[in-house]
Amino acid sequence: MIQTTFPDRAVMAELLAKMLWEIKAVHFNAAQPYKLASGMASPVYIDCRKLLSFPRIRSTVMDFAASTLLRDAGFEQFDCIAGGETAGIPFAALLADRLGLPMIYVRKQPKGHGRNAQIEGNMPEGSRVLVIEDLTTAGGSMFKFIDAVRAAGGIVDHGIALFFYGIFGEQRFADGKVRLHHIATWRNVLPSPGSRSSSTTRRCRKSSPSSMRRWLGRERMVA
């Protein structure tokens, strides 16, 4: 099913934030910060994998992802969709179905037996591959998958994360010659004090003391 509607970016970001709060995927713990895949400790964590358990939300988020890519990257820019082990795999399958494209998945490392493959599926050399992850902070884990696809002969100029922390990683993607697309950032989930009131905003403010805002205000991370 090819997605052909193009909602406003701000609307998509606001709705994804609302969905994440609705399914209780936004977590805060200043006393015991969460360790992210990037290795950094964060008082805030978002569990995008929970999106998979809610069919209406899952379908809507995939519509948003398809809209974002078609509008910002183009209609004929990809030959296949790659999901990174493990969270990116189901989202890659869903997005590939939306865009009518083949799907592959990339292991964190070769499996160590059989063909010792790191990439599973059919990816002809020279294929233009979009790498998808559920979320990214500094881009480290996504670039492990991007590097593996490139080493196998694929071309990766674009990546997409459903959720981007929006604090770190911009330079990493620029240096790696990858354009990162995303639907929402922490700026959407954690609105500014002057933003208009909504149920999401009120719940967010109730759960997010000043330490969260201080963390989100940091400029960047050295990868």
From Swiss-Prot:
InterPro entries: OPRT, Or_phspho_trans_dom, PRibTrfase_dom, PRTase-like. Pathway: Pyrimidine metabolism; UMP biosynthesis via de novo pathway; UMP from orotate: step 1/2. 5-phospho-alpha-D-ribose 1-diphosphate binds at residues 107-108, 111, 113, 133-141. Homodimer. This is Orotate phosphoribosyltransferase. Residues 192-211 have a biased composition (Low complexity). Orotate binds at residue 137. One of its GO terms (molecular function) is orotate phosphoribosyltransferase activity. The gene is pyrE. CDD domains: PRTases_typeI (cd06223). Its cofactor is Mg(2+). Its EC number is 2.4.2.10. GO terms for biological process: 'de novo' UMP biosynthetic process; pyrimidine nucleobase biosynthetic process. SUPFAM superfamilies: PRTase-like. It catalyses: orotidine 5'-phosphate + diphosphate = orotate + 5-phospho-alpha-D-ribose 1-diphosphate. Catalyzes the transfer of a ribosyl phosphate group from 5-phosphoribose 1-diphosphate to orotate, leading to the formation of orotidine monophosphate (OMP). Optimum pH is 10. Keywords: Glycosyltransferase, Magnesium, Pyrimidine biosynthesis, Transferase. Pfam families: Pribosyltran (PF00156). It comes from the Bacteria. Belongs to the purine/pyrimidine phosphoribosyltransferase family. PyrE subfamily. Residues 192-212 are annotated as: Disordered.
